[in-house]
């Protein structure tokens, strides 16, 4: 494992922990898109079904379990534990516009037409756009809490580091995965505007608010 992959995993884990702590400490999921969190739970479930059939390393297995457990814990908090604080009025993105196209694309463009490989490919495609309901929610409310901004920034850093991971692997290992790279680029592009706002506002102690 190279440094970019490791730092990317840490950034991803940090994002998840920040979100869980935000919800638990505030006893509220206000400002958090439940739809994005459901999509992430679907992503990790589809991607890590090989948990029972393919052992790579203890680190790899532990991270898979953590991602799945945390994603479903987050969904449970939003739709059950703190349901009264969930802002469903602003969380209105039509997720079928993300799930259906990525599922169809996974059947058409994949590395190997087997159930686990199709599910893995579907998870890669879906993850690249799973944050859209959250970004859409922020655009509707016009602002985001600081801790939510930190969560989104950590996710963006995770994807950016993974792009460097792919470059590293291609250069030193000759490994090239076009599906993962293109999906990663799409996901990183979606964060670009947010990165700018985060750097110019949140890091200066201001609340992230979108231009009118």
Swiss-Prot record:
Keyword DNA-binding included in the entry's annotation: no
Site (Interaction with the K-D-E-L motif on target proteins): 5, 117
A cellular-component GO term for this protein: Golgi apparatus
Stretches assigned to the Cytoplasmic side: 25-32, 80-92, 136-149, 200-212
Cited Pfam families: ER_lumen_recept
UniProt-listed GO biological process terms: protein retention in ER lumen; protein transport; retrograde vesicle-mediated transport, Golgi to endoplasmic reticulum; T cell apoptotic process; T cell differentiation
Membrane topology: Multi-pass membrane protein
Transmembrane stretches, start-end: 5-24, 33-52, 59-79, 93-110, 117-135, 150-168, 179-199
Keywords on record: Cytoplasmic vesicle, Endoplasmic reticulum, ER-Golgi transport, Golgi apparatus, Membrane, Phosphoprotein, Protein transport, Receptor, Transmembrane, Transmembrane helix, Transport
Phosphoserine carried by residues: 209
Lumenal topological segments: 1-4, 53-58, 111-116, 169-178
Database matches in InterPro entries: ER_ret_rcpt
Site (Important for recycling of cargo proteins with the sequence motif K-D-E-L from the Golgi to the endoplasmic reticulum): 193
Keyword Transport recorded: yes
PTM remark: Phosphorylation by PKA at Ser-209 is required for endoplasmic reticulum retention function.
Start and end residues of each stretch annotated as Important for recycling of cargo proteins with the sequence motif K-D-E-L from the Golgi to the endoplasmic reticulum: 204-207
Subcellular location: Golgi apparatus membrane; Cytoplasmic vesicle, COPI-coated vesicle membrane; Endoplasmic reticulum membrane; Endoplasmic reticulum-Golgi intermediate compartment membrane
Complex and partners: Upon ligand binding the receptor oligomerizes and interacts with components of the transport machinery such as ARFGAP1 and ARF1.
Family named by the database record: Belongs to the ERD2 family.
Function as written in the Swiss-Prot or TrEMBL entry: Receptor for the C-terminal sequence motif K-D-E-L that is present on endoplasmic reticulum resident proteins and that mediates their recycling from the Golgi back to the endoplasmic reticulum.
Name this polypeptide is given: ER lumen protein-retaining receptor 1
Organism: Rattus norvegicus
